Amino acid sequence: MIQILKNPQTESYIKAKEVALSGTLPLHWIPSDTGLFYYSHTLIARPEFLYYSHPVSAHADLFVAAIGETLNANDLADNGFHVIRASINVVHPSKGEQFSEPHVDHSFPHVNLLMYFTDVGGRTFCEKEEHDPQEDDVILFKGEHYMERPKRDRRVILVSTLQIY
């Protein structure tokens, strides 16, 4: 189930959004066998590579603060949370493949939290539901999911996986 969260638009969120949309954030091209390439800035590296999550960006603390403030504003993190991985993903419109492969991010229990920094479309699908994002939307879900390319401009989002206690 996709849960739409209240975005408190805290100072951390506003600064994080500015960083994500800046022209100075280093982005890395991520190729795909299916043709749906994208650009990414890893904030917290996934544990599957080194067996533990670890920050790899100077901006990690800012984005974790924005995540925590959003969870707290929605009464979801009374006992804390753990960010498993986080990155800024940027997808441009393009001809060819329009949908990513359906996938689950980890083989252990987790939820996904997405923050949408642009208003260009690019739906997110989870199980049998879909979310057509607006700028500043925040959603929480678990399960198999995939995304659609935007039809115009660049789709910039925070992608994170969490364990909430």
Where do the protein language model's features map onto the residues?
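Short beta-strand His + acidic residue motifs that chelate non-heme Fe in jelly-roll/DSBH
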Residues: 100-103, 146-153
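Short beta-strand segments enriched in hydrophobic/aromatic residues
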Residues: 92, 117, 143, 162-164
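A short hydrophobic beta-strand segment most commonly corresponding to one strand
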Residues: 113-115, 153-165
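A short glycine-rich, His/Asp/Glu-containing loop-to-beta-strand
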Residues: 73-95
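Non-heme Fe(II)/2-oxoglutarate
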Residues: 1-81
